[in-house]
Regions:
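Extended active-site neighborhood of metal-dependent phosphoesterases/phosphodiesterases
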Residues: 93-94, 100-105, 117-119, 181-246, ...
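Active-site neighborhood of phospho(di)ester-bond hydrolases with catalytic His/Asp-centered motifs
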Residues: 135-136, 163-169, 192-199, 221-224, ...
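Membrane-embedded segments
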Residues: 109-111, 123-211, 216-219
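Conserved beta-sheet core of the metallophosphoesterase superfamily
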Residues: 185, 270-350, 354-356
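Beta-strand-turn-beta hairpins that frame and shape the catalytic cleft
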Residues: 111, 120-133, 218-219, 226-239, ...
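Acidic, histidine-bearing metal-coordination/catalytic regions of metal-dependent phosphoesterases
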Residues: 9, 19-131
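Bacterial N-terminal signal peptides
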Residues: 8-14
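Positively charged n-region of N-terminal signal peptides that target proteins for export
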Residues: 1-5
């Protein structure tokens, strides 16, 4: 208890000291940002009055779409859903709803599963209900230790995903690369595992990671586009090589794709999707921010590894071209092995075809 009070006191001091420099880390947007997490679904949907007119909201079929409580094994583990658990936003051609499930002590090292039902006009019919598991920033062994890694793998297997996507920053030391890759290789999905690398991975142990990924048949997306095929149809997953080196990687790998393709762009940092034109991308997945790692009740993070400040902290956001971005808090930590009001999470995305 005393330790938590000390952390909260330190956080309060950091917050006060950061007020003077707040202008340095906050970017003025050309138009109001629209966040899914600001729109709660209940008997009515409350919408900010200043929403940009380019967003068209359709409330007709957004009710009663919460996932049913998990049965069987998960029920015994007392996994609980938050209340209110669902948030939604509709953009022209896209509908997104989210559900958060807190897993409690059922899985060490992971606090919650955040599921996004992502409905888009370019999703092929064969990909209706397609399940994507997305994790990032394991930083093994930081806060994530052996038991936590085992439980993370068990949780991912329990999700029965069709594909596993990983956003980079696998390790906190080269000696940890083989065990973390061996563990992730236990997660078998119909379409395999695809990953990009993070700044930690480029700074150290790059060759070790590439070698281990090849050994286990994982797909490394370094400015590369791969095709996911199902039922005679296809979608594309593209990955960014070192998004911090824009001199070499400042052209998006999605530029060669067609506007009516359904394209997922995987990048370690969300900043890349604002710094670089990511044309033809329909959904961007990113990590790196850790959700702030240490925040003031989840509302404000004194330190954010982004030159856009709080803008791309966590959750569903949009870049200036109104492309949706899902930014995960990740699993592990950097610098200090502590999280405060920035829960470690696994993200699930379920694809649906928008037909109306």
């Amino acid at each position: 208890m005393m330790k938590k009070l000390v952390y909260i006191s330190i956080l309060s001091l950091l917050l006060l000291s950061s007020c003077r420099s707040k202008r340095m880390i906050t970017v003025s947007l050309p138009r109001p940002a629209v966040y899914a997490d600001s729109t709660l679904l209940g008997d009515t949907i409350g919408l900010p009055a200043r929403l940009s007119p380019m967003f068209t909201f359709d409330q007709s079929d957004l009710r009663n779409v919460c996932r049913q409580p998990t049965k069987g094994k998960a029920k015994k583990q007392q996994i609980k859903k938050t209340s209110p658990a669902q948030k939604a936003i509709v953009q022209r051609g896209t509908r997104i709803t989210s559900t958060t499930i807190h897993v409690g002590s059922a899985y060490k090292g992971v606090s919650r599963i955040k599921t996004y039902d992502f409905t888009h006009r370019d999703v092929p019919a064969a990909f209706e209900g397609f399940r994507i598991a997305f994790v990032s920033d394991l930083h093994y062994k930081s806060l994530l230790k052996e038991e936590g890694l085992k439980d993370l793998v068990r949780l991912l297997i329990d999700q029965k995903a069709d594909v596993l996507l990983i956003g980079g920053d696998f390790h906190e030391g080269c000696q940890y690369v083989p065990p973390v890759m061996a563990a992730l290789a236990q997660v078998k999905t119909p379409l395999g595992t695809y990953a990009v690398l993070g700044n930690n991975d480029y700074e150290a142990c790059y060759d070790d990671i590439v070698r281990e990924m090849r050994h286990y048949g994982m797909h490394l997306l370094e400015h590369k586009v791969d095709t996911l095929r199902r039922g005679g149809e296809q979608i594309f997953v593209a990955g960014v090589r070192n998004p911090f080196d824009l001199a070499k990687n400042g052209i998006s790998p999605t530029l060669g794709l067609a506007p009516d393709d359904f394209v997922i762009l995987l990048t370690h940092t969300p900043d890349y999707a604002e710094d670089v034109p990511v044309t033809n991308s329909d959904l961007i997945l990113a990590g790196h921010t850790h959700g702030g790692q240490v925040t003031l009740f989840g509302l404000y993070a004194p330190i954010v590894p982004s030159h856009y400040g709080q803008r791309f902290l966590s959750g569903l956001k949009y870049n200036s071209k109104h492309i949706p971005m899902i930014i995960t808090n990740g699993i592990g930590t950097s610098q200090k092995a502590i999280r405060m009001f920035a829960p470690a999470e696994v993200v699930m995305i379920v694809l649906h075809r928008l037909t109306d």
